[in-house]
Amino acid sequence: MLKPVALSNTKRQHILFHGVILFIVMLIASACTGQSQESSIPEHLNNLQNLVVIQQNSLPETSVRFTRDLVINDNDSIKTWFNDVTSGGFAFGGSGWFAGLEVDDAGKIFIGDRYDNVIHIFDSTGKYLQRLGGEGRGPGEFTGILDIKIHSDQLFAFDYFQFRSTFFSLDSHDLIEVRDVYTNRTPDREELREWPSRPVSLISDDLFIVSYKNEMKNANYGTENYNLDQEILVRYYVVDREGKIRSDMIDELKDMKNITAVVDGNHLFNLSPLPFLQQPLISVSDKGTIFTANSDEPLIKMHASNGDYIKAIYIPMEKKAMDRDEIINLFAEDDEENTNLLLHAELPEKWPALCDIVIDDEGRLWVATITEDEDFMCKWWVLQDTGEPIATFRWPGNRSIEKIKNGYVYARETEVSTGLQTIVRYRIEMDG
């Protein structure tokens, strides 16, 4: 049995002093970003390794300002390039035409265009220089650009119809080479042999993120194979250009959510992702670090370029309540088909938590969360790759951030009244 020990006043004060210091340290640690605290996260995340929780009561003091610096509006060159017919009248536009944006060290801007299967090039002042590619199957031509990327001082574009990557010189813009890509080969994993697959993101010139799912979307309403009303899970792997899977499963995410309705005998459903519905989010940094998330949960997972899990970041938040009238008002008044869909479809009770994840050239995460504002606004968190908050700011939903480099944000902006889209560059100013 332990015996009590008598303490002098000096020793009591010494212990009390250190106890106070320890309490203060613990208080500070709990107020800042840290390891998961069971009281602030959902139960299913309690066993997730290396989980960092962003504490809402420890907002960073750094302020962020954006100064509009450049608007790309060379109408003679781009013509109807920004009029995105896939938006379906949605006020914040679609991205069907857009196949990525890259910026080189000299500030030249490269923009992929799926409609014309070309890459537009502008100098740092917004002057139109030229276009690369064009519709066709010859060297340097495309039939379906997935994305563009700068890697090893070259610009390359992946063509998902021809399964090949085309490389251009950053300086002269000359064609360098064309490489076949075999990501459509039967995978060397028994459990994935019969699963449809498609490349979804570029990691490097030889590595891709490829999705696999055990069933495709089936919109044949009234048949036994109809599944738009079901949740489909999608698995993601790192695959090289020879078609060999180079990773364990990176993540398993929920596929894009569909809402459906039958109106006057017509089966209606959304054809593309919408910000008020769940969708998988995948972002890859310039160095190949992979970030994944389901938009309906404020949890972002970080993976190495080989697919290995590193950590996860969780942002506790109350999700925005869904309001049918508010959603309908996001579409054009003459968009009868989507209005009918939204009037009659069963909608989720809440908006998703996230609308975007972007990685800047310094490896920082820019995470867009959906706010309670009546107008569609996003609250962006700027985080170190450790999860430490740097700054927050609010940004309109019609400004989609596509690239952050050299102290600038490059946004794809939709004119709400017309649906026309332009690329706008903003200078970033951070204080604090």
Predicted regions span which residues?
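Eukaryotic scaffold repeat domains enriched in small/polar residues
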Residues: C32-G432
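Bacterial N-terminal signal peptides
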Residues: H18-S30
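N-terminal secretory signal peptides that target proteins for export/translocation
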Residues: M1-L16
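Exposed boundary/loop context
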Residues: R12, V25-L27, G100
